[in-house]
Amino acid sequence: MTYRFSLLMIALAWSTLVQSGPKEDAIAAYEKFFTLFTTGNQIQVAALFAPDALFYGTGSADVVTSPEGVIAYFTGALSGTRGEVRARPFENTVLQLSDAVVAISGKWQSERTLDGKMVTAGPSRVTVVMQKRGDKWLIVQFHNSPTPKPRPVVAAAVPSG
């Protein structure tokens, strides 16, 4: 009897560990961006975006509002000799707005081999809004920009006297 009870308790504990909710599902879909970014396949990257997504890439002068615009952006961004490429998100803050909408803000950086040396780009700031449409989580809003350099600390003037 104790053995069966122990198995039941383990099964219940395991089921709560493997269940995920909207927040976890949205994060998993968002992290696919970084995996696909390293492949250089702009079509696959663009497929992560909703057809009506609002998109500001690092080099976008204006908001991009069409799938063709997103593909064109990544065609330029992912072209050229890339060598080995890695991309990783970090410092993510996640806000679940509903069962179908999740906002994620954080940073990310990419690393690529250039002339035999690993070169780091970033970190960049990124904010995305993920929305569940049907059975897929898609990016409906994306804004990426360079992280500003910290301002130098200026010592306060000490009054004499």
What is the predicted function of each stretch?
Residues 1-7:
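Bacterial N-terminal signal peptides that target proteins for export
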Residues 11-51, 153-161:
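Short, low-complexity N-terminal intrinsically disordered segments enriched in polar/charged residues
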Residues 19, 81, 116-117:
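Outer-membrane beta-barrel domain signature
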Residues 24, 42-100, 120-121:
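A solvent-exposed, acidic/Ser-Thr-rich amphipathic alpha-helical stretch
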Residues 38, 110-114, 130:
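Beta-strand elements of well-folded, non-transmembrane domains
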Residues 52-55, 60-62, 109-112, 145-149:
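Solvent-exposed loop/turn segments at secondary-structure junctions
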Residues 100-110:
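A short hydrophobic beta-strand element
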Residues 123-153:
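Short beta-strand edge/turn micro-motifs at domain boundaries
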